[in-house]
Amino acid sequence: MKPTSAFLSLLVLAFASGSAFAQNPVPPVWHQPTYSDIYCAGFIADKPLESGLFVVTGEEGGLKAIYSAGDTIFLSRGAGNIVNPGGEYMVLRASTDPVPQEFFKGQKEMLRSLGTLYKEVGRIRVNIVHEKTATANVMNSCGEIQAGDIAIPFNQKPAPKFLSAGFDRFAPPSGKNEGLIVTGREFLNTLGTGDKVYLNIGASKGVEVGQSYRIYRTFLPGVKDPSRMYATGYVPEYAGKERMNYKLTDYQKRALPRDVIGEIVILWVEGRTATGYITMATTEIYSGDQVELK
């Protein structure tokens, strides 16, 4: 075969392969939350939690400052407050965002108004109840347990029965339980499949554990999507007499269909907030993206 013919054959084959790939996009893959996802997700409480029980110190005479699974810790209360050994507790820590900048306009005020964000840092079991303290073993840890972390009675969380009903990128609005992603776990604002997120809707709006929500994005207002912020006021550029880009009018933006970019399953619900798990994403998800019940 002549070199030119061989090259043309390869070119045709590459084109055919590319066309086949374009016509058969990879279907979305859904992820199921694990035990760790469910019990380490955190939540936003309407009011600060009041608990006189907290971690005082740990083994090694207090020389150890952080604790994890398998370690022994000492709690602030004993007989009279903790009845019997064997009780299990969830260890929590109130959390604030160390970054002062907002990811979208009004994010900081929204977080403040919704309540206090708590990290779930571990699960412990009381082994010995002393007169004024208690000794406990760290069963599971989601991070570093530290002195001062509070402990509340452990409650089993229902595992969401997640069932995918298929994915429609341009699904029409359901009009149900509309809200938005306020922020992600550890205050992440750029998110993807497997990340935990906090929503600004909760039990008062009918949100329940196990519900599936669509994540979607519209062309308006657009300022909640950093990748589109550049397009909110630019002037079309020209190369000679050829226009290189196009500025959409607000009317045109409103006429365009919204883009469904992922799905969430609800892990936990408080009065005005909910914790969700991103089961699927077709692109990067951002704080400020909107959600609705499927």
Identify what each model region corresponds to.
Residues 2, 20-294:
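Surface-exposed, polar/charged interaction patches used for macromolecular assembly or partner binding
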Residues 9-10, 20:
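Cleavable N-terminal signal peptides
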Residues 1-8:
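Bacterial N-terminal signal peptides that target proteins for export
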